[in-house]
A protein has these predicted regions:
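Rossmann-like NAD(P)-binding element
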Residues: 52-114
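Rossmann-like NAD(P)(H) cofactor-binding subdomain of soluble oxidoreductases
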Residues: 88-154
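C-terminal substrate-binding/catalytic lobe of Rossmann-fold NAD(P)-dependent dehydrogenases
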Residues: 134-140, 149-313
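N-terminal Rossmann-fold NAD(P) dinucleotide-binding loop
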Residues: 13-14
């Protein structure tokens, strides 16, 4: 029996669990939250859609009961707080690092062989923290960010082309942040052909810029962070793993010399299989793209330094 746990039953976590259940990715989906009754209520609400939507996945909600997460194949961590007015970057990292570290350690007690997918922000840094705190092999700790950023990139490309998003291929690498992500316009295709055959360089740069502020744009419109696409992106990564699909998906993973970087988690294309990361795919970047990736990694590394400042590592 396949089992997935989603820690954090907020907007993103609940959406992720709902997509996993609807697509019958696993036989059982467990939602765990610290707030009494929230995950139980959302699980019951979702289960009451099963006959309407035609899925058989069992959804279980629990409040801080990690025993119910036992023997999970994949665990998705969405826990953490959003940055509040007046809160410094270090303060946010300090709070979320404590939450994510505690969650990861509790999960490992009951699911020692689980693959861990991190959605909590700052995502690259929380992925790095999880890897270092747990001491797991790098193939088992995966940050979701690149999958979400690439989906947004493909959306903006499809809007510019006037086509369906499924007709477009595109990828975003680098850090999961407004100034650190790198939409690879040179590699993007439409019906198998380079998008540069259809869009001007100016238009491609507009698409890249829209992608980079995609999350911020939604926050401005919604008054809070987005949840449908982040939750679905998390579920997409989980499905690729659970079903051993061998898909190439951009994810934040631990680098040991790939793309010229080491001791850092950053977004790069990887092949996802049942055991997590099968391999990191190294794209033939040009000099400009290499420079952007180096700058992105430097920014992520600066954020990682705060983990030591707050005593998380």
């Amino acid at each position: 029996m396949s089992k997935v746990t989603v820690v954090g039953a907020g907007n993103v976590g609940a959406t992720c669990a709902n997509v996993l259940a609807f697509n019958e990715v696993a036989d059982e989906v467990v939602m765990l939250d610290v707030k009494e009754g929230v995950s139980e209520g959302k699980a019951m609400d979702m289960m009451q859609t099963a006959q309407l939507l035609g899925f058989d996945t069992n959804i279980v909600g629990c409040t801080n009961d990690y025993e119910k997460t036992a023997n999970s194949d994949v665990v998705v961590i969405t826990s953490g707080i959003p940055r509040k007015p007046g809160m410094t970057r270090e303060e946010l990292i300090g709070v979320n690092a404590g939450i994510v570290k505690s969650v990861a350690q509790n999960i490992l007690k009951y699911s020692p062989n689980a693959i861990i997918v991190v959605i909590s922000n700052p995502m690259d840094t929380m992925t790095y923290l999880s890897l270092k705190a747990l001491g797991l092999p790098k193939n088992r700790i995966i940050g979701m960010g690149g999958a979400l950023d690439s989906s947004r990139f493909k959306y903006f490309l499809s809007q510019a082309l006037g086509c369906n998003a499924n007709e477009v291929e595109g990828m975003v690498i680098g850090g999961h942040g407004d100034t650190t992500m790198i939409p690879l316009t040179r590699f993007a295709t439409y019906k198998g052909m380079p998008v540069s055959n259809f869009l001007s360089e100016e238009k491609l740069q507009e698409v890249a810029a829209a992608t980079m502020v995609g999350g911020a744009t939604l926050t401005k419109l919604l008054g809070t962070s987005a949840w449908y696409a982040p939750g679905a992106a998390g579920a997409f990564v989980v499905e690729s793993i659970i079903h051993n699909q061998g898909k190439m998906v951009p994810c934040s993973v631990y680098l040991e010399g790939e793309y010229g970087e080491s001791d850092i988690c950053c977004g790069v294309p990887v092949i996802l299989v049942k055991n997590g990361i099968e391999k990191i795919v190294e794209l033939p970047l040009n000099e400009e793209e290499k420079a952007k990736f180096a700058a992105s990694a430097a920014a992520v590394r600066k954020t990682n330094a705060a983990l030591h400042e707050v005593g998380a590592l």
